[in-house]
């Protein structure tokens, strides 16, 4: 798989969350001032999840945002088919990789709301095992998603997922054990327990940086 020129400009190949202006790793938590945002500011985290790890990441992002005194709502797109963006000042979209691509619910949501996402402050995060040591593939998944949806977010986070062996059925547990043996990054083939590779500090930096870029008076709410 090849990475698009647009994505190469956004990511520098390092593990983590990236600043599109300079394509450098953001390595510190920002000291945000809550007074920058109106009490009416509301952020949506819309996500697709298969085994629950992306949902946990979305909830963590929502908690970080709420800790700054801003309203945040995390919604599973599978259960929110007719979701309207009218009441939000910013949107973060997230999905995870299964069978080599992000969930169709996520792609459908982005395609349907692309014009709104391009007007509002928005960002995308991708959850995959590839983000734990195989950044070339992690970036390629996002490039493919961009090509599929036509959306080129100004901020992208690449987060490592989890191996939830105890949640898998016998066949999937067996297949995942075989797959991880061939993957870089030191993924565990120990099926007796689950293995979470998500860097929660990285997730917090992603949320903090999104808020740092959000200027309420410039947020273009979509009028019905």
Question: Residue spans of the language-model regions?
Answer:
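Extreme N-terminal basic, low-complexity initiation segments
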Residues: 2-10
């Amino acid at each position: 798989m090849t990475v698009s020129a647009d994505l190469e400009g956004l990511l520098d190949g390092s593990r983590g969350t990236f600043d599109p202006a300079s394509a450098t790793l953001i390595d510190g938590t920002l000291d945000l001032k809550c007074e920058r945002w109106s009490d009416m500011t509301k952020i949506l985290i819309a996500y697709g999840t298969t085994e629950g790890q992306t949902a946990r990441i979305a909830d963590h992002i929502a908690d970080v945002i709420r800790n700054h005194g801003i309203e945040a709502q995390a919604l599973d797109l599978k259960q929110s088919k007719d979701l309207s963006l009218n009441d939000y000042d910013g949107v973060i979209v997230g999905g995870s990789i299964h069978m080599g691509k992000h969930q169709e619910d996520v792609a459908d949501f982005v395609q349907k709301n692309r014009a709104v996402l391009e007007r509002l402050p928005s960002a995308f995060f991708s959850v995959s095992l590839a983000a734990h040591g195989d950044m070339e593939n992690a970036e390629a998944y996002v490039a493919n998603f961009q090509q599929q949806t036509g959306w080129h977010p100004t901020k992208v986070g690449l987060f490592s997922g989890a191996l939830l062996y105890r949640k898998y059925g016998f066949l999937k547990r067996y297949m995942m054990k075989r797959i991880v043996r061939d993957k870089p990054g030191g993924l565990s083939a120990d099926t007796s327990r689950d293995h979470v590779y998500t860097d929660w500090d990285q997730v917090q930096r992603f949320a903090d940086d999104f808020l740092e870029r959000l200027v309420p008076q410039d947020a273009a709410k979509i009028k019905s």
